[in-house]
Amino acid sequence: MTKVILNRRAFVAATAATVATPYFYTRASAQDRVLQVGVYNSAQGGLIKKEVLPAFEKEFGCKVLTTEGATLANLASLRATRDNPIYSVMSMDDVGVPQAKAEGLIDPLPMDEIPNLKNVFPRYLFEDNHGVGFSVSIAGLFINPQMTQPIQSYEEIFDPKYARKMLLNTPKNTQSVLMLIVASALATGKSLQEAQYMTDEGWTKLADLKPNVLTIYDGEAQVMMVAQGQASIGGIEYSKAIYPHTRKGIPLDMSFPKEGAFTGINGLALVKGAPQRELGLAWIDRLLSPEVQKMLAEATLSAPTVNGVEFSDDSLKYLAYPQEQMEELNLFTPDWNYIIPRRAAWLEKYNTTFS
């Protein structure tokens, strides 16, 4: 769904505005300068529309139209408009960037035209700079800390004491791929990095988890089953689905076993043939600015991707930030170029395993 953030008074004011900006500025009416972008259909997307968009419109003398969606829907929007692009910037997770690049839907980001790119941690630039992360969640297990001790190793979740005590994320979600990598690491004794290429050896181990699975869940609301004591462990899940509950005092917390934690990266890409390229680059730069990065991180409890942002200790305990914390968590990002062509077959086998 496309939403136009517009009212008559704002339109008249913006049309008349010719605001000087540090870069990317050309004289034109706001009516002529319409930037269309894709944002996530989430609390984060709503926050960007409320806190970032109005100031951006005012500064650049333009209107910003937003389309809300998740990665797959946003990729579909780019395919549908390939011959006549309407978007200049599209939100997509790191998992979507290789596919978008392969299909020729996006262009590389010009490093010299987006000043804040220089502050981005290299691990959050994807596919020869065809995408950049701007918000990072951590994926691991979640528990009720009043009932379950932190999980030291993923091997523990296979213990018979957890029979019918685990919530397993649906095979439809990316998190299921992460659980397969975990099973492969346990089966082979290899690191997560190595085990992602050895998944044929992980299926038997994954099947061993079946007696412990209470249910397969496909909605964030179901994580409350752990808080209510109906289950002991859940996962693999992103921290952005858990930590907001933790902050409210609900008995839910993340647990990151010694094998490592996974990244969940929200990103941005410059659309090929972007009709408002300069405004699009300015939009990306704005979302990577220290001020916006700090605001988004504190509101959504997902880490920034740029260096040098300062947080209170209360905020930092929820974030994979700064660099030292990333290393302590043994933070790992899968090789999506390897995984994506195999994912359909894995999904089918996953469904068979847990049917």
Show which residues each predicted segment covers.
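A bilobed periplasmic-binding-protein/Venus flytrap-type ligand-binding module shared by bacterial periplasmic
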Residues: 140-147, 184-186, 264-277, 295
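N-terminal secretory signal peptides and thylakoid transit peptides that target proteins
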Residues: 1-19
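Periplasmic-binding protein-like
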Residues: 137, 200, 204-209, 238, ...
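Mature extracytoplasmic/periplasmic domains
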Residues: 271-330
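Extracytoplasmic ligand-binding site segments that recognize negatively charged/polar headgroups
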Residues: 42-49, 86-227
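A ligand-binding cleft/hinge motif common to bilobed small-molecule-binding domains
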Residues: 96-99, 232-251
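Early extracytoplasmic/lumenal segment of secretory-pathway proteins
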Residues: 32-98
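Short beta-strand->loop
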Residues: 107-115, 129-131, 158, 233, ...
